[in-house]
Each structure stands twice: as C-alpha cells, then as structure tokens.
Amino acid sequence: SQAIAGVQVAVSANSPLFMGHKLWHESRIPVFKQSIDTRTKELINQGVRPRVWFGERWITSVFDLFEENVRYFSPLLPEGRADAGAPFMNGDNPGLHYLNLHNGTIWRWNRAIYDPAGELSHIRVENRLLPAGPTVKDLVADAAFYYGLVKALGNQTRPVWSRLSFEAANRNFIAGARNGIEAEVEWPTLGTVPVAELAEKYLLELAAEGLASLDVDT
C-alpha cells in the first residue's frame, strides 16, 4: 500500500481547491496534516513526528507499527492503569481496547487496524488515500485499481518494496498529491517516469491481473 501510494493519489486526486485557492491536486492531504499539527517549531526541530504521518521506513510486521505508536506518540487522553480495568476478551481474542484507542489518534495514510470481531477477528489495512468522487464510477475504479495492484504486487517473487526505497515512496506520495496526473514518480527499473505513463503502460495490467486472481471480472 505504501509503495503505490504516490501513484494511487496521483490518478485519483480530486480536491484542488481550498477556501477559494487552487492548491495541490489533492489538497486534502496537506490541509489535514496541517490542521491538526500541534507541534511547536522546537518540537519539530527535535524530530517529534506529526500525528498525520506517512511513515519513515518499511516494516516487517504489523507489530512494528504499534511499537512506533507507543514510541513516538503520547496518548491524547492518558488513563491510569488502576482505572483501566481488567483486560477485555472478545471470545478467544483480546479486545485490546487501549491499543485501538491510541491507534485511532494517529492518522497514517495506510493505517493498520486490529478488529477483535469474535470469530472474524483480523488485522486489515485502512487505506485512507482514496478521495470522494467525483462520481461513483470513479470511486469504484480507484478502489479496484488499489486492490488489484496490491494483490498483484504482493504475489511477486521480489516485492516492489524491496526494490524501491522508502524515501522514494514518500517522495512519490508528495509528488502525486501535489501534481496529480501530471506528477513524475520513481519506479524500480524505470527510474523517474510520468505517473500517467507508468499507470497506463504497466500498472493497469498488473491491477487487472490482481483482480482476476480474486475472481473479480474486469
């Protein structure tokens, strides 16, 4: 999800205007980040991370994300252990209420969610890049592109994230949000290419293959 974030936001960008000004092609991303960034200049200079966050490295386990949550972000509403009560179980699965409560105050653009839903307890990725509209067809197409591409890239022998630096993925994300379909992004073996060319010549076919493997008619 992180590796394709730049491409995803570039092809689906749909919020170029904010308060009468033309800003980024997907202005929702910088506006949301700035609107809840309470860090002072001193804290920024000290390296304190913003709560709206793309991340800073590839991870090997979802536990890495929850560990980062604890390491980098203090609770917004701290509660003493004596007031927390006994650990809650949802069937055979731990409820982890406070883990989820804390996780919900950190707005990653791809956020891991632990859902203790009884027999269907699971961990999923909440992809928060998808904009609204402009039409239902656009929404469905953007979602299909994302799911198909994630599936296809995840099935590759050598995953894309092993060939693309995290720094490059972050630059792609910013470029896609800023410049939309006119952005240029970095991609393994191709170097820096126009995102429209990358999507049309390479990624749409991969997304179709991924959807086909999920028995989705394209």
Regions found by a protein language model. Name each.
Residues S1-A5, A141-L153:
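Short amphipathic C-terminal alpha-helix that caps PH/PH-like domains
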Residues S1-P131, T157-W161:
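Loop-rich catalytic cores of soluble enzymes, especially ATP-dependent carboxylate-amine ligases
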Residues T60, Y72-L96, G154-T218:
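Cationic, histidine-enriched alpha-helical/coil surfaces that engage anionic ligands
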Residues L101, W107-E126, L139-A143, R163, ...:
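A glycine-rich, aromatic-flanked flexible loop/lid motif
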Residues N103, V140, E197, K201:
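Electropositive phosphate-/nucleotide-binding environments in soluble metabolic enzymes
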Residues V125, A144-G148, E205:
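Feature representing long, continuous alpha-helical segments
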Residues V125-P134, E186-T192:
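Glycine- and acidic
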Residues V136-L139, R158-P159:
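Extended hydrophobic-aromatic, low-complexity segments
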